[in-house]
């Protein structure tokens, strides 16, 4: 049996908890995210509307993989598949380790290229550019479509109004084989941008500031929709930068609207691309202009954040954390010397970024002792930058060019940070050790600030190149409200009933076992020392389950128990054993305040079911506030009625403690669980 991952609408006692609604109890309009998912969901009843919290089977418009294409291909072939379901749906790009000329890497690249040619898949070789940039340039990611990729920065596509979201390799193999995978529609947060961005501030400053001022997981595992009158004045490149870093903000997507600015962008793309182009042409752009889609007036959002753009100024992330952001005004006064500067990545190495940096650096030289690295997002971007002279201006200043690709951003190739060094980068992540040594310090900033810092030899702004101080920064004007309504359910009330497949239980119940901690990571669930012991028996997996969290866990728990834990359960690595070890203990359900996204996908993919119920963990924390035990048998019993989308919790004497509606678990997801997980489901589809 397995665990499934459902969520509830609940009061938010901890910022960042999922607040989801069930379509079976709410009759309302849809937001833009839900409308796009509706378009790409398959197997729905004719009158079925999808909402946050629902599990759906999706058939995305396109699926991109990069250097991980060969592991995906290996998994695909391991499923017994021989031909991809739809070669027009799949895109392969080589972008991460393009500087690596080792025999092993070249062999992998050769295998990917050959596989793509054999299958008729669109393939872009090393040097053509970063996959996400190619997806946008070539129109695979397109406004109002659903595009996925086996990469965490798939959120980028939201900048052009495409619902982009990441998947794991098993999902990608499923799409290759069947055209489909599953998705749970996240809670949707509306981020309203008001006012106009002041001179000197950029799209990068918006997202860096957002990551810093809302840094308590407010949008963790949410889909974001950017709205407000401030959006219309943001260029598409600014939108792409913002959407790209919604990943670091913790979101699963970052969607901008289709508006006049975006339509004008595509009018220009039509002029630039060879015509007739299969995806970006006069007809597709005309259709986009005439058939804009917006959220319904009565759409529901889990959160509503408001930021006044006019109160922003240049901001910098770090060191070594995107949750720490400091104004350029404050940081420039600290005289932080730098060793390396980077204008690379899918975040900020488009043409406008390179031109902005060139405008700052032209006529100057990179400071002595500083190495400045530049790589275009794609070969097309580099050609355009060369054509306008911006590329040469940067090279003449002393920058070192790298091939179009990810490179230093992912910690690969030339120019990585060494022990004790300080770097400033226009990339998206500055986690400790990501861009080189764990003993280095990494900051993130806009292309303009990176270029100025490279010349100054310290973190500073363009104003300082003219001998002027960085202007003072105002306090950022912002607010956040949460939809804190709780669905209190009358157990006798009638409601729509969910069909249950043969082999799937109509209800799941057991005693709640409290593991009272937030951020229990995959190593806490399944110790890393066992991860690569492929021959470890199931009984041993059951024995070591949760031992790094609590060595007494195995003595205190039994088959059929239900783990309940705090927020962000299963954060950390992608190891699938974190899910399968729980199954090995014959536990049918895990409940938490929230889950790590990769863990939640691995749960379903391995036939493990989970529920998010923030209100329940909050109640248990109140009850056991004085306890020091890591694992507690609560004497509370949970029953999940799958047919009614409803959870009830009672004590040992039968007293009702909580009744809660949850998202709908349809027959599509039930089928995956009955088949033993996504791989079993794919094999069954291939047989049929």
Swiss-Prot record:
Disulfide bond positions: none
Catalytic activity: (2R,3S)-homoisocitrate = cis-homoaconitate + H2O
EC number, UniProt record: 4.2.1.36
Transit peptide stretch: 1-19
TM segment ranges: none
CDD domains: Homoaconitase, Homoaconitase_Swivel
Cofactor: binding details: Binds 1 [4Fe-4S] cluster per subunit.
Cofactor: [4Fe-4S] cluster
Listed PANTHER family: HOMOACONITASE, MITOCHONDRIAL, HOMOACONITASE, MITOCHONDRIAL-RELATED
Function: Catalyzes the reversible hydration of cis-homoaconitate to (2R,3S)-homoisocitrate, a step in the alpha-aminoadipate pathway for lysine biosynthesis.
Family named by the database record: Belongs to the aconitase/IPM isomerase family.
Protein name: Homoaconitase, mitochondrial
Gene name tied to this protein: LYS4
């Amino acid at each position: 049996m397995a665990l499934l991952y459902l969520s509830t609408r609940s009061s938010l006692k901890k910022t960042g908890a999922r607040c989801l609604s069930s379509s079976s109890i709410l009759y309302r309009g849809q937001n833009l995210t839900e409308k796009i998912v509706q378009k790409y969901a398959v197997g729905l009843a004719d009158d079925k509307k999808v909402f946050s919290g629902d599990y759906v089977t999706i058939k995305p418009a396109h699926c991109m993989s990069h250097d991980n294409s060969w592991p995906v291909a290996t998994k695909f072939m391991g499923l017994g598949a021989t031909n991809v379901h739809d070669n027009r749906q799949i895109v392969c790009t080589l972008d991460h380790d393009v500087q690596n000329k080792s025999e092993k890497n070249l062999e992998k690249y050769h295998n990917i290229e050959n596989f793509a040619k054999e299958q008729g898949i669109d393939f872009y070789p090393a040097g053509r550019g970063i996959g996400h940039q190619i997806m946008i340039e070539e129109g695979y990611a397109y406004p109002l479509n659903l595009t996925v990729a086996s990469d965490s920065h798939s959120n980028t596509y939201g900048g052009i109004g495409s619902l982009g979201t990441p998947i794991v390799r098993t999902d990608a193999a499923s799409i290759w084989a069947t055209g489909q995978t599953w998705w749970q529609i996240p809670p949707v947060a509306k981020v309203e941008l008001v006012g106009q961005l002041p001179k000197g501030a950029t799209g990068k400053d918006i997202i860096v500031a957002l990551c810093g001022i809302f840094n308590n997981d407010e949008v963790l595992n949410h889909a974001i929709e950017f709205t407000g009158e401030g959006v219309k004045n943001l260029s598409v490149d600014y939108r792409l930068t913002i959407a790209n870093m919604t990943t670091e903000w913790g979101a699963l997507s970052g969607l901008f609207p289709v508006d006049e600015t975006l339509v004008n962008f595509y009018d220009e793309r039509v002029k630039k691309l060879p015509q007739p182009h299969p995806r970006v042409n006069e007809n597709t752009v005309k259709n986009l202009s005439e058939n804009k889609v917006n959220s319904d007036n009565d759409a529901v959002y889990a959160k509503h954040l408001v930021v006044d753009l006019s109160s922003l100024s240049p901001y910098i992330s770090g060191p070594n954390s995107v949750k720490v952001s400091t104004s350029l005004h404050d940081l420039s006064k600290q005289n932080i010397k730098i060793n390396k500067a980077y204008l690379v990545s899918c975040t900020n190495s488009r043409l406008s970024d390179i031109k902005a940096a060139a405008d700052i650096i032209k006529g100057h030289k990179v400071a002595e002792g500083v190495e400045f690295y530049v790589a275009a997002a794609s070969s097309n971007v580099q050609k355009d930058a060369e054509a306008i002279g911006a590329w040469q201006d940067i090279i003449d200043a002393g920058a070192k060019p790298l091939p179009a690709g990810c490179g230093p951003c992912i910690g690969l190739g030339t120019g990585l940070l060494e022990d004790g060094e300080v770097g400033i980068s226009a990339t998206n992540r500055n986690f400790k050790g990501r861009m080189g040594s764990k003993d280095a310090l990494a900051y993130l900033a806009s292309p303009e600030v990176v270029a100025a810092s490279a010349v100054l030899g310290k973190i500073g702004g363009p104003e300082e190149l003219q001998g002027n101080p960085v202007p003072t920064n105002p306090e950022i004007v912002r607010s956040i409200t949460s939809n804190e309504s709780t669905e209190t359910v009358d157990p006798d009330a009638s409601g729509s009933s969910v069909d249950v497949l043969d082999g799937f239980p109509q209800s799941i119940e057991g005693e709640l076992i409290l593991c009272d901690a937030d951020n229990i990571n995959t190593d806490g669930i399944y110790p890393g020392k066992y991860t690569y012991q492929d021959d470890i028996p199931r009984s041993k997996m059951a024995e070591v389950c949760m031992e790094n969290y609590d060595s007494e866990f195995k003595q205190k728990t039994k088959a059929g128990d239900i783990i309940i834990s705090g927020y962000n359960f299963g954060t950390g690595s992608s190891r699938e054993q974190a899910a399968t070890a729980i199954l090995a203990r014959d536990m049918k359900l895990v409940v938490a305040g929230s889950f790590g996204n990769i863990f939640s996908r691995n749960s379903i993919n391995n036939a493990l079911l989970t529920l998010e119920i923030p209100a329940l963990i909050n109640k248990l924390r109140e009850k056991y506030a004085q306890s020091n035990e890591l694992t507690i048998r609560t004497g509370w019993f949970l029953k999940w009625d799958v047919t009614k989308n409803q959870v009830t919790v009672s004590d040992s004497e039968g007293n009702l403690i909580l009744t809660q509606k949850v998202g709908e678990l349809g027959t599509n997801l039930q089928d995956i669980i009955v088949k033993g997980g996504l791989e079993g489901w794919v094999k069954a589809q291939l047989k049929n």
